[in-house]
Amino acid sequence: MQIFLFFFSLILCFVLISSQTLEDDKKALLHFLSSFNSSRLHWNQSSDVCHSWTGVTCNENGDRIVSVRLPAVGFNGLIPPFTISRLSSLKFLSLRKNHFTGDFPSDFTNLKSLTHLYLQHNHLSGPLLAIFSELKNLKVLDLSNNGFNGSIPTSLSGLTSLQVLNLANNSFSGEIPNLHLPKLSQINLSNNKLIGTIPKSLQRFQSSAFSGNNLTERKKQRKTPFGLSQLAFLLILSAACVLCVSGLSFIMITCFGKTRISGKLRKRDSSSPPGNWTSRDDNTEEGGKIIFFGGRNHLFDLDDLLSSSAEVLGKGAFGTTYKVTMEDMSTVVVKRLKEVVVGRREFEQQMEIIGMIRHENVAELKAYYYSKDDKLAVYSYYNHGSLFEILHGNRGRYHRVPLDWDARLRIATGAARGLAKIHEGKFIHGNIKSSNIFLDSQCYGCIGDVGLTTIMRSLPQTTCLTSGYHAPEITDTRRSTQFSDVYSFGVVLLELLTGKSPVSQAELVPTGGENMDLASWIRSVVAKEWTGEVFDMEILSQSGGFEEEMVEMLQIGLACVALKQQERPHIAQVLKLIEDIRSVDAE
């Protein structure tokens, strides 16, 4: 009878979700929430589920819920049946770090679109049912740090799209099934009660993924030389050893007598690999809270930012920049700020101003975090990298793909539009340089690191003198203006044209002369009417006949780097001049 009721419920649930709407999704989540006493979410019937519900994301059409992120909200008890499972378009579900109890929800089989499931750090228990073959789109499954027991279900082999599997720190027992998961790149079965050997299909993973179990090492069949059987090979090897020892003994006794052989053991220094960027055990720093922009909320928490695998992109005067992959496999840039000289209130005010800037050519500030020990700014990630990397990386190498003139013109156009948007709000950037200009998918330049100079300690005078990007007046005042931004942007234009780094370098120094930056070098060359010699050979070697356009851009760049700031154009004028060279939008 119980089995009949179970299958009847599943069929009924399937009928209900087959014609579901956003309103039905909303009712399902309200039903879910009604089982708990949580005041943190602020969900209600009258509010807009797609834009104001904490942790909820809708699809582009705004007609279905596709993501529910509710980590560490404080839920207690069972996951209410037939609530979340009614979200038939759900792709991402994170309920980690709560206090859920009971079995794995059997009705999750209805979540056919689910790609990411995070239930780690709860108190779920019992055996896992053989239901995973129904979730064929699942890419990430994390059930670690619970109390699941029994055997690991063989139905996991049906998850042919699975890339990450984490079942660590449970009480699974028995042997590890031979899981044939072609796309699996990460697995963790450590700290369970598993026995037997690691199956052949999983032997490509590191042993640490299986530590803390009662596994025995699989004996590998060793091949012997010349195709001999192992017994024959051992007999021949033994005979050879006897002959060698006998011969050596005879030589030592008859010819050399007793000799001493001394040796020395060399100790090898062991060095541990560089540690990952990890968070503290708690994130309860005074007032620490992530603030999101754009009507979005609860997209990630501090643990996501600090505990995820992070790749260092660079270190600069304002701090260290990391590339962080989130649990939903999206990527953001996290800048860990140092030398912040303003208090919380001024920091938050500045971040709010930056967060209101919305433009396709300005890197979006997604969120920020302020506490006594950490100040973080979270930005969009551009997978094409920065202009500095593209322009100067691997220069001279055979596999380098040079930037053509069309690409450089798009970069200049996009960056000018971004800076014009910033200046439009009477705002100052203060640190324009090629490493702060990123390339979008269409190769337009996008301005990053907006507004950080106003909350950071002033750059030292030596940095201003040697960077090559800063206007002459910055050396004395160390205060940025919109005209100093224009100067820095002009240097970027010259950098695009010449392919040379603005920082003082030997190739820009005349024989017996003093060091000069890029702008000074170009002024000296143009004064001698050798204009053609400044252009990057990577552009000149390409066909197209763009020399006239390049000369126009050179004149714009030189106007921007005028020594007197009152002689420099406004960025809006610069943008118009660049767009007048040639329209790149229609290409």
Swiss-Prot record:
ATP binds at L313, G314, K315, G316, A317, F318, G319, T320, T321, K335. Residues 1-19 form the signal peptide. The chain crosses the membrane at residues 233-253. Residues 254-587 are cytoplasmic. One of its GO terms (molecular function) is ATP binding. It is found in: Cell membrane. It is a single-pass type I membrane protein. Keywords: ATP-binding, Cell membrane, Glycoprotein, Leucine-rich repeat, Membrane, Nucleotide-binding, Phosphoprotein, Repeat, Signal, Transmembrane, Transmembrane helix. The keyword Transcription does not apply. GO terms for cellular component: mitochondrion; plasma membrane. Residues 307-581 form the Protein kinase domain. Glycans are attached at N37, N44, N149, N169, N188, N214. The protein kinase domain is predicted to be catalytically inactive. Coiled coil: none annotated. LRR repeats lie at residues 89-112, 113-136, 137-160, 161-183, 184-205. Pfam families: LRR_1 (PF00560), LRR_8 (PF13855), LRRNT_2 (PF08263), Pkinase (PF00069). The modification Phosphothreonine is found at T462, T463, T466, T477. The modification Phosphoserine is found at S309, S386. InterPro entries: At_inactive_RLKs, Kinase-like_dom_sf, Leu-rich_rpt, Leu-rich_rpt_typical-subtyp, LRR_dom_sf, LRR_N_plant-typ, Prot_kinase_dom, Protein_kinase_ATP_BS. Gene3D superfamilies: Phosphorylase Kinase, domain 1, Ribonuclease Inhibitor, Transferase(Phosphotransferase) domain 1. PANTHER family: OS05G0588300 PROTEIN, PROTEIN KINASE DOMAIN-CONTAINING PROTEIN. Residues 20-232 are extracellular. It comes from Arabidopsis thaliana (Mouse-ear cress). It comes from the Eukaryota. This is Putative inactive receptor-like protein kinase At1g64210.
